[in-house]
Amino acid sequence: MSSIKLIVGLANPGAEYAQTRHNAGAWYVDLLAERHNQSLKEESKFFGYTARLNLAGQDIRLLVPATFMNLSGKAVAAMASFYRILPEEILVAHDELDILPGMAKLKLGGGNGGHNGLKDIQNKLGNNPNFYRLRIGIGHPGDKSKVTGFVLGKPPASEQTLIDDAIDESIRCTEVLLNEGMTKAMNRLHAFKASA
């Protein structure tokens, strides 16, 4: 079993970004809170929106930073330091260009794949990359020069449905991760592919 104490959903703040692909991590955390009859509330000392859940018998904090994506580490480090949470007790949910919509994958540690949110979190955690990541597939525009516009764009309804289905399965697999550990959660989540 994995002892995750903090689950973070990455996003850009403000209504104009709420429905953009880059905010997929926050969609997951918001839905996770909602499923447990909680809602995130602004907590300025953590530079973000927070909630507290009992998940699989474990006390877990949720966080969606209110900073821009490339400054996400400020909120994560503030909360981790206050509650004495180690990098390996953190799960960060984020949008992933290298995975198709309708799929999501879990991993521990590794690179940041050019994701500015992950980059800043690793930086602010003392350059420690050993935190869990939930990589929510958004697909790739096919051309590197189009990436910024793509992640800051809204997915069409057909893709949104696929992303939502993958987030739904990710929430079920979060309980598996907490109860039965990383291998079981990965095996289940990585076998999932939403169909249109």
Swiss-Prot record:
InterPro entries: Pept_tRNA_hydro (IPR001328), Pept_tRNA_hydro_CS (IPR018171), Pept_tRNA_hydro_sf (IPR036416)
Record site feature (Discriminates between blocked and unblocked aminoacyl-tRNA), residues: 12
Binding, tRNA: 17, 68, 70, 116
Keywords, ordered alphabetically: Cytoplasm, Hydrolase, RNA-binding, tRNA-binding
Residues forming the catalytic site: 22 (proton acceptor)
PROSITE patterns in the record: PEPT_TRNA_HYDROL_1, PEPT_TRNA_HYDROL_2
Pfam families for the chain: Pept_tRNA_hydro
EC class of the enzyme, as a word: hydrolase
Locations listed in the record: Cytoplasm
Gene3D superfamilies tied to this protein: Peptidyl-tRNA hydrolase (3.40.50.1470)
Site feature (Stabilizes the basic form of H active site to accept a proton) residues: 95
EC number: 3.1.1.29
Major localization class: cytoplasm
Listed GO MF terms: peptidyl-tRNA hydrolase activity; tRNA binding
Keyword DNA damage: no
GO biological process, one term: rescue of stalled ribosome
An example Gene Ontology CC term for this record: cytoplasm
Subunit structure: Monomer.
Family: Belongs to the PTH family.
Protein function: Hydrolyzes ribosome-free peptidyl-tRNAs (with 1 or more amino acids incorporated), which drop off the ribosome during protein synthesis, or as a result of ribosome stalling. Catalyzes the release of premature peptidyl moieties from peptidyl-tRNA molecules trapped in stalled 50S ribosomal subunits, and thus maintains levels of free tRNAs and 50S ribosomes.
Name of this chain's protein: Peptidyl-tRNA hydrolase
Native source organism of the sequence: Yersinia pestis
Originating gene: pth
